[in-house]
Design a protein with these regions (language model features):
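Non-catalytic signal-transmission and effector/linker regions of two-component phosphorelay proteins
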Residues: 1-6, 116-135
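Two-component/phosphorelay signaling modules centered on CheY-like receiver
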Residues: 14-32
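Helix N-cap/capping motif at the beta->alpha junctions
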Residues: 33-42, 63-64
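Short amphipathic alpha-helix used as the core "switch/output" element in two-component signaling
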Residues: 42, 65-78
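Active-site beta3 strand of CheY-like receiver
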Residues: 47-54, 58
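His-Asp phosphorelay/catalytic-motif detector in bacterial-type signaling
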Residues: 48-50, 76-81
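Alpha4 helix (beta4-alpha4-beta5 surface) of REC/receiver domains from two-component response regulators
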Residues: 62-66, 88-111, 118, 122
Length: 135
């Protein structure tokens, strides 16, 4: 079976990584994982994923916010869609920008945790279709 696309999952929650890696692989995606923003940036450079699923808050002040800023301001990677997943958006007042306004977090879509696999797959398929159509 050929791959539907290369997906990078970045989250410090190993249970989240294991569960969603299995879901994505079962639906035809090639999956790479990283447990920190630093490791995620290395994986982006080596794997050139078609999309990134990114946790907002990780340990040791290693936030998805910083990761997304680095990706979306790099000419080589800025077109890679980012699907942000978080359990803190409502509680902390984080705002997500689906536009490049310079103030909000740069992401292409977001989901609240816990993430339902069918919703994750639907959103991911939509992001990948938009990216293909834009080429």
């Amino acid at each position: 079976m050929s791959s539907k696309g290369k997906i990078l999952l970045v989250d410090d929650d190993l249970d989240f990584l294991d569960m969603h890696t299995a879901v994505l692989k079962n639906h035809g995606y090639e999956v790479f994982t990283a447990t920190s923003g630093r490791e995620g940036l290395e994986r982006v450079r080596t794997e050139m994923p078609d999309a990134i699923i990114l946790d907002l808050m990780m340990e040791k002040h290693d936030t998805g916010f910083l990761f997304s800023q680095k990706i979306k301001t790099d000419p080589l990677f800025k077109e890679i869609p980012i699907l942000m997943v978080t359990s803190v958006a409502e509680a902390t007042g984080y705002r997500f920008s689906l536009q490049d306004d310079g103030y909000w977090m740069k992401t292409d879509d977001f989901l609240d945790k816990p993430v339902k696999p069918e919703v994750l797959l639907e959103r991911l398929d939509t992001l990948l279709k938009k990216r293909r159509d834009a080429r």
